[in-house]
């Protein structure tokens, strides 16, 4: 049985969450296949993707348990309900929108709420967020995460925004439970050209690097 706890565990085990902003609804499916082939199975389809709920539904139906498909850039309640109705296993908001937590938990799904400051991060966690999205991570860096977790060690932090191949190690060493990866993986050139072999190759670099770092720490 799929539960919010099992989904959170799967996301932590996956380690990398691909943040997908597809050009079209149809593009999300081959894109997701390419990510899976490269070893990345956690896929966050953002609401900046046209017809995002339909994209979530199609990818979930086609990939089944091979992927952990969620919805990203969720800022309104109607988006949250649409994502859950489409089969999203997790919901991600880039902002501190605690009102989304209850409906997601009522559906027995996981939610990641955005935060920037220590107060926002702790508020998200105390309000019931399963994970706390620190965004934009490139502005703050691994040293901020490490400093944040010193007084707040229980925070399940997922940095997103600017995570690169060479920052996987410092972010994990800072105590992050998973990493959200966007444009450094799903590059504009790949999306513009539908170059899925290139995406698979790049995804493999990220997933291999994650394994290497996890084995060393």
Residue ranges and their predicted role:
Residues 1-86, 106, 154, 165-166, ...:
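Conserved N-terminal beta1-alpha1 strand-loop-helix module at the mouth
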Residues 21-23, 49, 69-77, 93-97, ...:
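Glycine-rich beta-to-alpha transition loops that act as phosphate-gripper elements at the mouths
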Residues 30-31, 76-86, 119-127, 144, ...:
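Catalytic cores of alpha/beta
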Residues 39, 63, 87, 95, ...:
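Conserved functional loop/turn residues at catalytic and ligand-binding sites
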Residues 33, 126, 138-141, 145-146, ...:
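Mobile acidic interaction elements
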């Amino acid at each position: 049985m799929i539960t919010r706890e099992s989904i959170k565990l799967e996301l932590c085990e996956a380690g990398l969450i691909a943040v997908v902003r597809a050009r079209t609804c149809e593009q999300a499916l081959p894109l997701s296949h390419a990510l899976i082939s490269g070893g990345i199975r956690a896929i966050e389809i953002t609401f900046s993707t046209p017809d995002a709920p339909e994209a979530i539904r199609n990818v979930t139906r086609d990939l089944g348990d091979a992927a952990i498909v969620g919805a990203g850039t969720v800022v309104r309640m109607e988006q949250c309900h649409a994502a859950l109705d489409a089969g999203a296993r997790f919901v991600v908001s880039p902002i501190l929108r605690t009102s989304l937590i209850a409906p997601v938990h009522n559906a027995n799904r996981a939610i990641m709420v955005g935060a920037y400051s220590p107060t926002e991060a702790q508020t998200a966690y105390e309000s019931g967020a399963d994970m706390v999205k620190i965004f934009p991570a490139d502005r703050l860096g691994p040293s901020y995460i490490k400093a944040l977790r010193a007084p707040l060690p229980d925070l399940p932090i997922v940095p997103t925004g600017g995570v690169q191949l060479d920052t996987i190690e410092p972010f994990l060493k800072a105590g992050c439970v998973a990493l959200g990866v966007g444009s450094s993986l799903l590059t504009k050139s790949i999306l513009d050209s539908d170059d899925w072999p290139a995406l698979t190759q790049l995804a493999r670099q990220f997933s291999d690097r994650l394994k290497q770092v996890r084995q060393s720490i």
